[in-house]
Amino acid sequence: MNRVAFLGPHGTFTEQAVWDFELDDAHLVPVDSPSQALAAVRSGEVEWAVVAIENSVDGAVTSTTDALIEAPGVQIYGETELEISFAIMTRPGETLASATSFATHPVGYQQVRRWMATQVPAAQFRAASSNAAAAELVASGEVDVAAAPRRAADLFGLEIHA
């Protein structure tokens, strides 16, 4: 069985990338950062790590670049490209009009900030450790809106508005 570290929780774009590698026997290990994912490889806790390297809007993912520099001996074995599409979600029954806060990963923020500024102007941004973690923040009532993968809405029982 291949153990694979990825930026968690379940429902992230990084988890989606894991499935693109078709590791049928993969045991997924969610971690909180690219640095933790690569450290898990170095320690032998997992055989593989899947981390985001770049995106089309904001360029290089600096937290991953930094983590690779700090992880001598770790080798890149493959890559995949994902079509990224954010869903805007709330707790069931809530509206975007009443939202005062929203969360997403800082890299994701660069991709949705203009839309959020025009569609939900009262919502103040809060950084989350991942886009799916932003959905968890909505589910727990800590923020009103998340920009996250559609799968995160399913996993955390949220309603998609856009």
Regions found by a protein language model. Give the residues of each.
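Domain-level signature for soluble enzymes in the chorismate/prephenate branch of the shikimate pathway
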Residues: 1-162
